[in-house]
Amino acid sequence: MIVGQHIPGTSYLHRSSAVAKIIFAFCFIPLVFLANNAATNIFLLLFTFFALASSKLPIRYVLKGLRPILFLIIFTFIIQLLFTREGAVLFEFGWFKIYEEGLRLAIIVSLRFFYLVSITTLVTLTTSPIELTDAIELLLKPFKVVRVPTHEIALMLSISLRFLPTLAEETEKIMKAQQARGVDLSAGPIKERLRAIIPLLIPLFISAFKRAEDLATAMEARGYRGGEGRTRLRESKWTTRDTGLILLLVALGLLLVYLRGGF
């Protein structure tokens, strides 16, 4: 998932409210686990591709969201393939055997990762960080009754989302500077690699603390006193488009249950 980046657009998902998109993403998670056979996975795969295509986002951004968990997907695939020993033997070479159930589970688990990361990436790329945090604050509003500091939580999320791309860019600059000095972060034993990371972390932490201090000073100078009396440039309103998005999710769930053999 790509966090802190927003690509403006005019697609259906772009024009839906952030509240509806967050509800859609959270409710999509349990639906993924309904896909346990070929029919449900083919349908969910087609739905995910349709969502990606209709968002009109450059495919490189979606692939960028998948890249951080690519190792996890491959690792999970191999683990399921090697340690699930049920069903007919599909391939055998000495001690190495691939079982039918192992291959089935490996494909299903890998696809689940793909579905989840693709949809959450779509939500974050089609929603600006400020809209995302305002929506979270709105969804947390009922918890104000039990004195949960919803505005402060939303503010922390907003600042985190704002500075994650900045810190990532800063990390890349420091890495290039270290490599220019002859530091190789990808070679040698693990102990040496960890030792090579220390010169990378220290300037990164110093930069992060300096940015935090500058931000706190700027907020104080502008008279920030919490969420009391705060107004917003754009108020989030529930529209028929948002209702359509949730109804689409309900239809998806019912169809998955049917294809799974639940009716």
Swiss-Prot record:
Q: Does the keyword Glycoprotein apply?
A: no
The family database entries (InterPro entries) matched by this protein are listed as: ABC/ECF_trnsptr_transmembrane (IPR003339), EcfT (IPR024919)
Gene (name only)? ecfT
Q: What is this protein called?
A: Energy-coupling factor transporter transmembrane protein EcfT
Oligomeric form and interacting partners: Forms a stable energy-coupling factor (ECF) transporter complex composed of 2 membrane-embedded substrate-binding proteins (S component), 2 ATP-binding proteins (A component) and 2 transmembrane proteins (T component). May be able to interact with more than 1 S component at a time.
Q: Which organism is it from?
A: Exiguobacterium sibiricum (strain DSM 17290 / CCUG 55495 / CIP 109462 / JCM 13490 / 255-15)
Could you tell me which CDD domains the record lists for this protein?
EcfT
Topology in the lipid bilayer is annotated as:
Multi-pass membrane protein
N-terminal signal peptide: none
Write out the annotated subcellular location.
Cell membrane
Record-annotated membrane-spanning stretches: 22-42, 69-89, 105-125, 243-263
